[in-house]
Structure formats: C-alpha cells, structure tokens
UniProtKB/Swiss-Prot annotation:
SUPFAM superfamilies: (Trans)glycosidases, Carboxypeptidase regulatory domain-like, Chitinase insertion domain, Cna protein B-type domain, Starch-binding domain-like
Any one GO cellular component localisation term in the record: extracellular region
Catalytic function, reaction form: Random endo-hydrolysis of N-acetyl-beta-D-glucosaminide (1->4)-beta-linkages in chitin and chitodextrins
Source organism of the structure: Flavobacterium johnsoniae (strain ATCC 17061 / DSM 2064 / JCM 8514 / BCRC 14874 / CCUG 350202 / NBRC 14942 / NCIMB 11054 / UW101)
UniProt entry keywords in alphabetical sequence: Carbohydrate metabolism, Chitin degradation, Glycosidase, Hydrolase, Polysaccharide degradation, Repeat, Secreted, Signal
Disruption of the gene: reported phenotype: Disruption results in cells that fail to digest chitin.
Protein name: Chitinase ChiA
Amino acid sequence: MKHYYRLLFLLLFPLLASAQPAHGKKVVGYYAQWSIYARDFNVPKIDGSKLTHLNYSFYGTTYDPAHPENTKLKCLDTYADFEHMEGGIPWDAPVKGNFYDLMKLKQKYPHLKILISVGGWTKGQDLSPIAASPVARAALAADMANFIVTYPFIDGFDIDWEYPLSGGTDGTEIVNGMPVPPQKYSPDDNKNLVLLLKAMRQAMPNKLVTIAAGNNVRNVSKQYLGPNNRAQYGMTEDISTYCDYITYFGYDFGGNWYDKTCYNAPLYASGNPNDPLYGATQSESLDELTNQYLNVIGFPANKLIMGLPFYGKKFDNVAANSTNGLFVAAPRYIVPGCTNPQNPTGTWDGSGACEKSGSIEICDLVGNPVTNSHAYLDPNTMMVTPSAASAGWVRYFDNTTKVPYLYNSTLKQFISYEDKQSMDLKVQYIKSRNLAGGMIWELSQDTRGSIPNSLLNQVDTSFGSVVPGTVSISGSVKNGSALVTDVTVELRNASNAVIQTVVSANGNFAFNNLTSGQNYSLTALKATYTFTPVTLVNVTVNQTAVVINGTQPTYTVSGTVLDGSTPVSGVTVTAVSGSTTLTAVSNASGVYSIAGLTAGLNFTVTAAKSGFSYAPASTVYNAIDSNKTLNFTQGAPVVNYTVSGTVLNSTTPVSGVTVTASFTGGSYAAVTNASGTYSLSLPSGGNYTVTAALTGQTFTPASTVYSNLNANKTLNFTQDVVVSTSKISGTVKNGTNPVAGAKVELVLPWTDNTHNWKSVIATTDAQGKYSFDNSVVDGYTQVLSLKLNSWQNGEVAYYPNNLANFAVPANPTVYNFNTSSTAKSALAAAANLISGTVKNGTTPVAGAKVEIVLPWTDNTHNWKSVLATTDASGNYSFDNSVVAGYTQILSLKLNGWENGDVTYYPNNLANFAVPTTPTIYNFNRQAVVATKPVVTITAPTASAIAINLGSAINFVASVGLSAVDATTISSVVFSLDGQSLSTANSSGTYTAAWTPAANQFSLSHTLTVTATASNGTTDSKTYSFTLTCSGANCPNALPVITWNSPSNTTVYQNTFQVVPISVTAVDSDGTVSGVTITINGGTFNMTAGTNNTYTYNFTPSAYQDYPVVIKATDNKSGVTTLNNTIKIATVSTNRFIPLPSKIILGYAHSWENAGAPFLYFSQMVGSKFNVVDYSFVETVNRDGYTPILTTNDTRYLTNGVFNKQLLKNDIKSLRDSGVPVIVSIGGQNGHVVLDNVTQKNIFVNGLKAIIDEYQFDGVDIDFEGGSMNFNAGGLRDISYAGISAYPRLKNVVDAFKELKAYYGPGFLLTAAPETQYVQGGYTTYTDTFGSFLPIIQNLRNELDLLAVQLYNTGGENGLDGQYYGTAKKSNMVTALTDMVIKGYNIASTGMRFDGLPASKVLIALPACPSAAGSGYLTPTEGINAMHYLRTGTTFSGRTYTMQPGGPYPSLRGLMTWSVNWDASSCGNSSELSKAYAAYFASQTAAKTLVLDDISAKSNATIAYFKNNALSVTNENEDIAQVDVFNVLGQNLVSHRNVQNNKEVLLHNQSFSSKQLFLVVVTDKAGNKKSFKVMNFLN
C-alpha cells in the first residue's frame, strides 16, 4: 500500500501556482497533531499562503537500550495521523487522517515545506540516549529517510529536544491523567545533538534538517554549539554545519511557576528588580536571547529564526498594589492530591484537577469558541470590549518590554498575551537584526470566525513592510536572456558574510530593509551553473533591475554508425531530456555529432532509420558532465506489416479511437480519423495484442492477438452500445456533426448547508457526448439551468438555450444540444413536426414514454418504433430526422406497459399522415380534462411577518383558469385560520386585508385562498406564516417554553434514580425572570443554565404517572404554562426484543453512500437480517464523552425540516417485525475517551437518553482508532481490581456495566472490535494491541455477543503459532474465531483472556469486496469456515485445526458490514445474507419439511424426489417459478415455468448425490413456499 501511495502522489501532484509570502523571510508555523479534537482546527484550515514552512508536531521515538538498532519514529496518535476522515476524506484514500490533509495542503501550496517535528515537551525524553548512541542515531535517521520515501510530500525533520543538559520535564507534571517522565540528560548532550543532526544530514542529504532551540538565556550557550563556542567542547562541527535553519523559543520566559506576575515573551528586559525575569547583568528577554545565539554561540543570522507566540499566561490571586498588577505576588492554587501547585484554568484545560496550564490563547481572548472562555478583547481592534471593561478589565502596554497585558483589580487576575501591536514590533526586531524569519507556536491558537488569522496576517504584513531609513536590492538571475528558475540568491556584507538568502522559484529576487550606506555583494547558487557575483558600493538608494549572470556548460555526444565495417549514412541520432530534443544525422562516413547538451541534465540517446534497428537501443547519460563517444551498429533490415481497419458505431464511423498494439516492452498506437479508419505499421515476427479504446466506450472485439506477425492484417472494430446510467447526459452537434470539446454547464441551487449553489462543467468527447456523474446531483432536487454558454464555446450559440428550473430527473435522461435552432432535447421544440405534452389533468408527467411507430416504406425506410421521454414539464418531441422519408404514421401513443400500466388519452391516434408543419399532440391520463381555476398567492411571501398592533396585512392572490373557454371564475374566498375575510377583485387580482388583535401575535397562522369555477371545479392554495409584534403599541409577548428532556417521557427504571428535567424558556421582548416546576405535590425553582435552559433533577418514589406543570414568568409578570406527564415504569422483560437462536446481524448506515445506498428500516422488514445495528452514535465535536446520534436528516423530513418522529417510526417498523435494533457507538469517526468519572456519567446518561427516545434494544461497542487507546499498556492484572488503576479502561467497563444493570438482563450488549485490539494481544500487549481484552474479560457476564471484525486491520497469529492474514481466507476465520472461544495468554504479561462461550460469538465479515479494504470472503468460503467451527466438517484447503474443545455447535452466527452493502450491486442483491440464511435453514435435515408458510394459499404445494428428479406439484394454482439452493446458499436451478401447469419435474446433476436442498416455489398468484428436501437416493 505504501509503495502504491507514493506512486499515486508522484503522479498526481499538480504543479500549481498558488499564493505564497511575497517577502524574503521564512515563516515557520507549528501545527499540533491534537488540534483536530477540541480545537476543531484541521489541516485544511491552515493558510499556507502566509507560511514558508509547516512543522507537524509531534512524533515520538521508540528506543530500547538493549537494541539501539531498532530505534524508530513513533506515531503518537494513529487516529489523528492516518485514520480520521473529517472534511470529506475519501473512504478509499490510500492514506487518511492528517497526512491526507497534509498531502492536499502541499498540492494547494507547492511552495510550502512540510517537516515532521520530533520530540516536544512530553515526548523527547529519549533523544538524549538516542543521540549518545551511534547505532541509535543512525537507525533513527534511516527511519526518517524511509518515512520520506513513503510520504514524499514531507520535506524534512525538525528536532524539538526540550532540553539538552538541563531543563525540561521533572516527572511531577500530569498530562491526560498520567505523569510525564522526567527528561534524561548526558554531559555530552550538546555534542551528541550535533552528531544526531549529522546522521540525519547523511541519511537525507537533500531534505531539510532543523532544530527548535531553547529559551534559557543563561544556559543556551552551554546547551547548543555554534561556530563561536564549539571549540571549547572539542568540536570542529556544530549545529549550523548540518541544519538548514535553527528556530528558537521566543516564549515561556515568564509564567505561573514564579508565583508572581510577569511576561510570557518580553521583547526587551524590563529593568525592574521586582520582575522575576530580571538579572543585574543578564535578564530573560528575546533581545538578550537573540544576542546569545548571534554573538556568544555564533549562529549565522541568515539561519536563525525567532519564535513568536500566539498565546500568553494567566495569573490569579494577584496582590493589590500601585503597579497595575505588574511584578507582584500571584500564588498558584494548592489542590489536594496534586504534587505541584496548580495554575489558573487555561483556554483548553480539561477537568483534570492537576492538569491546569494557565495558557491563554488569542482565539480565546477575542471570543472564539473554546473550552474555557476569557473573551475580553474586540477581534477588530484588539481593545477591551465594553462588557469586559465594565467587569473591570483594563489593557496596558509596556513600552519598555514592548508587550501588552490585561489586569482586573476586582478579580485579581493578570493576563500576559500577544496582539497585533506586539507582533508587529517583534517582526520589526527580526528584520532589524537580519534574522532569517519568525517561527510561530502554534497556528490553531490564532483568531478564527469572521476575522481569522489576525496574528498570522500581521506577521505577513509586518515582514512585507519597509523599515524607514533602509534600502532594498531587487533584480533577477539570468542565463543569457532567460531567467534561471529554482535558484538560491545570497546577499553578503562587506565582510563577505551571508546576511540574507532567498530561494527564487522564478529567478526574481528582492532583499528589503538593508542598512543604507553599506557595501553589498550578490551571487547565485545552482548546480552545474557558474555565476558572476555583483558588487554594489555605498548603497544609499534602492537598487532595482540588478542582474546576476550565469552560464551553464554544454557537452557533445558523437560517434559512428556502422553496418559491420561499412559506414551508414542518413541515420538520425536523437538526444532527449524532458522537453529538450537534439538531433544529428550520420554522414557518408557514418559519423554524427550532437552538440549543446546542457550540463547536469539527464539525456537518453537513440539511433533510428526506417526499416532498421540499432544497438545499443538506447543509452542514458545521467547529469551529463563531459563529452561522450557513442557508436551504433546497424542490425538486419526490419520488415513491417500493417494492421488496419475501421471503427464503426453501427454504420457511423467513429473518430478519435486509439487503437493500440501492445507487445512485451512497449506498444504502437494509431488514432482513427473522421472516416473511422486507422493503420498500424508493426515490425514482423512480433507478438501483438490489439485493442481499441475511447473514454466511456467499449468495442468488439475486446482484443485480438497476432503471434509472429508475418502478413498485413485487417481488423475492424464495432463500438458497443453503452447505455448511460447518468441522470443527465446527451450529445452536442453542429447540424449532424458531433462537436468535441464543447463545454456544457449544469447549475444547481442552494439546497441545504451541505448542498450549496454550484456550477459544474462537462466537456464533450470525440463523439460529442457529455454526461454528469450522478454524484454531481446527489442531494439536489432542482436544476437551475443546463446550457452551453457561448463565451465558453467560441461565441457559438447552442440550442435549446432555455433549459431552466426543472427537477433533477429520477431516471437517466438525454438532453441534446445543436447549433441549429431546431435542435431537439428532452424539451419540446416548436420546430419539430411532432411534439406535445403529457399531463395528469393539469399536472405535467415527467418520464412518460411516447411511442411513434412508422411503417415499411422502402428499402431504406423500414418499419421502426421510436420512443420519446417527457421532461420535467411533461414536454416531448421527435426530431424531424425520425420521420424523414416517411409519409404515414402507424400509431402515436403511450403504451400502458411502458408507463406503469397507466392509460393515457387519446389512445387512438393511428394511421395518419406525417404532418408537414409542426403539430402538437397532447396526451392526458384523463379522457376529458375540465378547465380548472389556478390560484397563486403573490403577497406576502415571508414565513415571518412583524407589524405593530393596529396595523393591517394585505393578502394578494392571482386567480386565473387552466384553459381559455367559456368557463369563468364564480367565487374566490380568503379565509384565515378558518375565518373568512372580505375580498376585493381587480382584473383577476384578489385582495383581502386583516388587522390582527393583540392575542393573535406570537402565533402561527394559515391563509387559504379557494377559487371556484363556473363548471364547479376548484383550486386552493395555502400560505402559512408566524406573526410577531414590532412597534410601540405591541402587547407584552409571553415567554415561550420548549420541553427538552427527557425526550421520551416514559422513563424505564429498575430502581428509582434521578430524572433530569430540562426546558428552554425565552422571552422575545424582554427577559425571563424565573421558571418553576410543580411535580409530585411540590413547586420548585428550576436552575438557570446557559442558552436559556432551566433544569430540575427529579427523583421519583413510585412507578406511576407524574403530572408536570412548568411556569415561566417574564420581566413584565407575564406567565406561560407548559403541561406534561412523566411516566416512571419498570424495565419489563418484554421491553427488549430477545436475540434469535441463530443470528445474521448487519449494520445499517445513517448516511448516504452511492456505492451502498441508504435503506429505511422498513425496507429491512422481511430481509434475512434478524438483528440490525444502527450506525452510529458519535460524540459531540469529538469530545469523547457526549453521545449524539448521527441521523440522515434529509430522509426524514416534514415540510423540509428533519422530523425525528419519522425516524422513530421507521425504527419501530423493523422492531415490530420482531427484529431487535441495537445502536452502535463509535465507528470510524466515533471518538470515545472517558478520562474521568464525570465524563463517564455524561456518557452513560447520554446513551440512556438516546436508547429511551428511539427505543433501541441495546448498545454495540464499536470503538476504533484512538478510542481503543486506554493508556493501559502497563496493565498486568486483568481483573476488575487490576484495571482500577487505569481510568480510561475502568470508566468504559463501568459505563456498560451501569447500562446493563440499569436496563436489566433483557438489554442487549454487543461489541465489534477489530483484530488488532483482541487477537493482537496474543503476541503483543500495548496501549492499543490487545487493548480491548480487559473490556471483554470484565464484561463477559454482561456481553451478549462479540463479533471481532475479521477485515481491514489484517491478520494475527493463531493458537498454533501460524500467522493468519486475509490471504488465508477461511483458515483466518477458523483460526481467529477459535481464539476468542478458547482463550489465550496475553503476550508475556502473565495475564490470560479466558475466552467466551461460542453462543456469544459471531464471525464478522464484509458483505462484499467494496465494503472493506480487505478481508472479503465469498459466502461459500465463509460458510465453509463456519461449518467447520460448528460441526468439525473439513473443507478444501483447510490448514488450521481447531484446538481441543471444538467444534462449537452453538457458534451464534454472522455479523456483516453492512445491510446496505449486502443490498447493493456490489453485494449481488443480498447474496451474503441469503446464503447464510439458507445455511442455517439447512441444519435440521428432513425429507420434506415446510420452513416458512409464506402464504396460506400455497398449502397445497408438495416437493419431493423421485428417481433423482425433483417433483413439484400444486393442486390449486399453476406453478410460475421454482428455485433450488444447496446448503451453502448457491443457486442450482432457477426454473421459470412457461407451460402454465401445476406440476414441474426438474433434473440437475447435483440431484444425484445425497444432500439437502432448499426449494422455493412461486405460484402464478405470487404466493411462495419454501421446503427442505433431501434426496435419499432410494
């Protein structure tokens, strides 16, 4: 897969010209892997136009001191990196997750360099021992190089070692509930870091190598070696020797650890002795840190990049004094159970008591959605908002340190942060010091929403600004007059030190903000080029149009061409490099010479002359660097033969078809011309396979093989008839000639938030054909327009040009276009001799089929039948070419059998002359169509109307008639909510006025306009709207109460527990002053929460109905009452549908999928699935603990709005048929992590609400990816007591134990983990491998079913020690299923998984090949494995033998992904479920056994064997169909009885063996009956 992926990337990577920074500085942005979770900041949201480099952070390392050679990179979150599919990542993408998004980001911004950052604060502890070991650092560097081969869009690696020698973690910090290991040190860390970088450079000579250096002003000269300090440590090389650039932390100078307010990132020292960062000789600041790196360590300025923070620090408990909160005591919190004092709560801090960061990000300060809000700044001005100011917040700017801060003396809080002002000053500082650029930590911290990327935009703007008093130098690099692309330009000072570097993609360069009055020199660097430096003296004004000239040497390839010893003239020798081709022709002496081969390029040299071959066939010179001599020898004359012919579509020539003759090592090709002819000249004696190809077409013959070609051949092809499955397709012609390359535009309207307005272009092929894939119109119901725009088609007009506002066709429909105005499409065209409309009364009928039948007229005009299909407006037409040459029409009609058995009138249009002028022939379902009124309500049209009390609303309707005859309008009645209104008429425009009373506001109203015609026909239209009051006279609007929870007011409880009651109360013209609840004899105040919610926790005391009265009072004493009833009921044994004895379980999709179409649960009634899992419950914003049911909203609409009751009814329809419906939590996108008891309780209560509301029969645990990491790799006691030390593990177990206990034993609990997390534990136990085994072990009594997914994640070792992967098919199923029943020791942990009873185990397989990435078995292969496991009966190819204890006759059945895939075309119309159903049905053999009395009318049917023939008789009805299956579900006989008799005798070779058959008999009345029949051969 990885090799395929790399090839795919290299082939598809587009050469795009996209936006990139215009300045010459580097802008390095760190992106945190975890940003996809709470932050919801996925990679596609990164603005690559403002960055030059992106550091993806972080990767860790695996290091074993005993085996340093195994040191490798370590992915820290496989779900984030490679598994998630957020943002529409294709399910079949070769890599998913952030790495897919990084690839797409690179495609969007080709200039952007993407690096993997290794280490970080919590995952760099092993960098010290790795760097100290020559073997380990070489192994790590080699793994990095391999990583880039696999993912070629990665440009290098960044080492974030925090920190060499000193600093970093101390082992007391807690992250995600676990202590972070302490940083490891070696006295030689500083030297070993250089050696690690050297190993990386050697392994990746052409890739980027960088580091992130620390911020400790007093220590960095010891921690990092550069040109100025390396000698004192005995080094002749340093970090800058091997790094492309060096970033350094420009933040975390000050923080809460000082228990005193200070700055996170001061640009300059404060000079204040009270500042914790102050030092008499050396303070902590960016300026002093930069001086250390430049002057003490000696890093070149053009390699040094300064860090820029997008975050700051918060301090609480700030002591009051006169410094506005600055440099005063701010002690942290002392929290029981925490080793360290705790910081204030930061932007994204979770509920962990000992995990507070105090970190405040700019996105938080400007009010963007975060976990813990500190919204004090206006996002436009970045000044304090009025509400924050009124709460006591004040912004200060320290002009000494050049940073802002916020202080609230009332709350005693202080926040150090960065804004646009401080960011600009930091960037100006970078420019003034001639540093290489700025580094950002971290991109997801920037502002979002309506004003995104404020700080990143400021960085870009500031780098592009000109510093007053400076000069710039700009120009280009050229070779002659041509620009030299992809060239490096260096700017040096008078001391010849490089001060700035630019890599120019197009050859142009610019250096800005240079000190005036200095001497500068410029030169360029590029392999194989020689450049002349340019020197500029005393530069006091801007220098433009500076040209650096370069030259590139050229070389010659020469030699002779001989036939034996005889010179050969006239031979063309060609040297090719990319698009460059150089040639020479040999002279009479056989000599040739090709000059001008550019140095450094790769050239392929060949010789050619018609009828001859030459040796060598080709010679490649890679990176040519000298003159070359190459001689050729001419071979024997080559005789060529032709393969030629024509390609026709019926009798029409087909142009543009590529005919290819393939042979070992290559191919020859020709393209058919306008006459459809082609000709291939092929060397004799070869073996060729000849095929024809044209996009979207197939041809007969598919291929023809010529072996040892020794004569000319004629080979004609016929284009096959291809029936388009596209709903919208057609042809574009100029008269009768197809138009290739025409652009057809389809415009679709905004439909919902996921189906926006869009325009899609289809381009015609060589045959003038176009089509739109059905995915283009999926989710849309209407087409705004379908046309060819003249401005896109050479100013040529195509007709029709009025295809607009029609419904998306349900079936494939052809829309043709032509340059002639008489061109015909699915719309009627008046110029056609025969056209018309088809209607049902006055309603157009789309998709109706109109047949014209023409008689035999002469030898060129035979009898023919042609169909026209109506468009969305019911229009049809026949092109005049259809009737050309005919004088008579046999019939024109709509056949009932082609139109759903509907009769259309007239039905007697027959034997009439072909009209000579365009004539309309209309059809209707009604024999006589009465003229009817037509009502249109024209005003108002808004769904909400706001007026003042005393104002009137004027209703307006237009009333006409459907046809012009003697019929008139006799009356028009306006009624509002059933009450008539006075009406006025003016020329068919009717009006009525209504002045609402005070009590009619804040309500919904419906206007009905009914018109009656003189013939008694009527038409009515309605208009619904809500009325609100707006103005001085408005009465008080009462509060509105909405019931939230419990959503299902029947609450099932085994014991009395709290029932949370929640409502929403809002007041449109004021505020809600209070909400009360009266229940169980008492009245209580409800607790106000966010978003106008009010809650009350009610604990029942009896199983009964509890009336509930909720009253909301507004600020004007207006009261609204809401009544409801909560029923507390026991969990009865019949609340949940029990599992069947033999199970076929399928997952049902809650989304659309073109390959596996959506199915309603009602459609599953009667299918072979007897248990169905609803997919899926996920968690809100992937928080890991707040369940939310995914729903296919567009499938359950009422008046265009999702109606959950329709979904409930749909689920109920399947449950009513006796099939349990279980809801599955997780899936590929369902992220579940329960870090603490609070999250566990939210999770359990959320699942209860979903289960109760939708009446699910149980819950299925389908955790995948990151949800399977329980941080329990160190577990060594699998018991319940043992898992208690691992919160994630214990909380999951407790959650499902609580659900089972709450609902009782009838509640179904199932699980469907992947093999990695179950059988993977046999050989390896880590945080993920085998991670689900403790869950199964501790839920073994609660679990009803376990179905380990034997697909996608690959195979594992079986109990016999052999590896069983998907290639071993049936043997993999038997081996891995045997494991979960038998049990096994868990790796080398000393723990044991005890296995589950076979009655709780399902085998789990994909329904068809497309349903999973791997693991598909045919029904026969799967049933072979199941039959062996259940009975011990062997199968062909079996290599695995069950362990003692098998077989397992109680093995419960099959789970499959999914019901939808099984029902799809991929699933061959439910082949899998039918086969397993037949297998289970076959397990109780009987000579003749009725399985299923499908219809009472078929009780006279008998099936039995006589003389090895199957006899089927029915005394009452003729037999229509007999189908016979074997026990594997394979169809042996499908006999359609055309004799209309009551007895059928069938013969089949399979009947001659003693076995059991399933016979399904269908009679003429459609009744079915199925039998098990055994041929006992007697």
